[in-house]
């Protein structure tokens, strides 16, 4: 009986610790973060158009396209495809993406296409592409929007984020918001 009482006390203690105290502590820490843990939003004219850290689908030809998503940009179902480079379905999907890029960008060669433009990230929600991924789209965007190609290229270059660790990236939503403001 003594052991049962000790086990019951331990159970209640861990229940309170992990079901009440720990979540409240994490919630409190999140409230100290920028935007109180609600995510880093991107707004246009006071209206939230998206989140900086979650990719969105852009498939219109007058916008920069982001990295493909294995979950069709559904944040509730964040996941990769779990298909490796030896999977025939995966290889066919990557080839289809390459073919689409080459069709829409006839000035490109297959070797010009960066890998991030044809493969999904582990989360399926990557908001960033490589600078090369953005730069290969400049000619299409300039033509679609009837803008000077140098102006669009300059915009891309101004949106390149240099990290302390890791590769340079371009946030697609931020780039497209800036593109909409470009005249």
UniProtKB/Swiss-Prot annotation:
It is a single-pass membrane protein. One of its GO terms (cellular component) is plasma membrane. Keywords: ATP-binding, Cell inner membrane, Cell membrane, Ion transport, Membrane, Nucleotide-binding, Potassium, Potassium transport, Transmembrane, Transmembrane helix, Transport. It holds the Pfam family KdpC. The chain crosses the membrane at residues 10-30. It comes from the Bacteria. GO terms for molecular function: ATP binding; P-type potassium transmembrane transporter activity. InterPro entries: KdpC. It is found in: Cell inner membrane. Signal peptide: none annotated. HAMAP family: KdpC. Belongs to the KdpC family. The system is composed of three essential subunits: KdpA, KdpB and KdpC. Part of the high-affinity ATP-driven potassium transport (or Kdp) system, which catalyzes the hydrolysis of ATP coupled with the electrogenic transport of potassium into the cytoplasm. This subunit acts as a catalytic chaperone that increases the ATP-binding affinity of the ATP-hydrolyzing subunit KdpB by the formation of a transient KdpB/KdpC/ATP ternary complex. This is Potassium-transporting ATPase KdpC subunit. It comes from Flavobacterium johnsoniae (strain ATCC 17061 / DSM 2064 / JCM 8514 / BCRC 14874 / CCUG 350202 / NBRC 14942 / NCIMB 11054 / UW101).
């Amino acid at each position: 009986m003594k052991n049962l009482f000790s086990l019951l006390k331990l159970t209640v203690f861990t229940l309170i610790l992990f079901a009440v105290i720990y979540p409240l502590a994490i919630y409190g820490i999140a409230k100290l973060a920028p935007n109180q843990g609600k995510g880093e939003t991107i707004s246009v004219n006071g209206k939230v158009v998206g989140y900086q850290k979650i990719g969105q689908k852009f498939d219109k030809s007058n916008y920069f396209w982001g990295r493909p998503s294995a979950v069709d940009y559904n944040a509730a179902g964040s996941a990769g495809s779990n298909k490796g480079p030896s999977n025939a379905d995966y290889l066919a999907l990557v080839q289809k993406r390459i073919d689409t890029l080459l069709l829409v960008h006839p000035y490109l060669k297959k070797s010009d296409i960066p890998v991030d433009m044809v493969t999904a990230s582990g989360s399926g929600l990557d908001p960033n592409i490589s600078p090369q991924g953005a730069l290969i789209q400049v000619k299409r965007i300039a033509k679609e929007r009837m803008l000077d190609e140098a102006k669009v290229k300059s915009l891309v270059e101004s949106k390149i984020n240099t990290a302390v660790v890791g590769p340079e990236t371009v946030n697609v939503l931020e780039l497209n918001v800036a593109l909409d403001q470009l005249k």
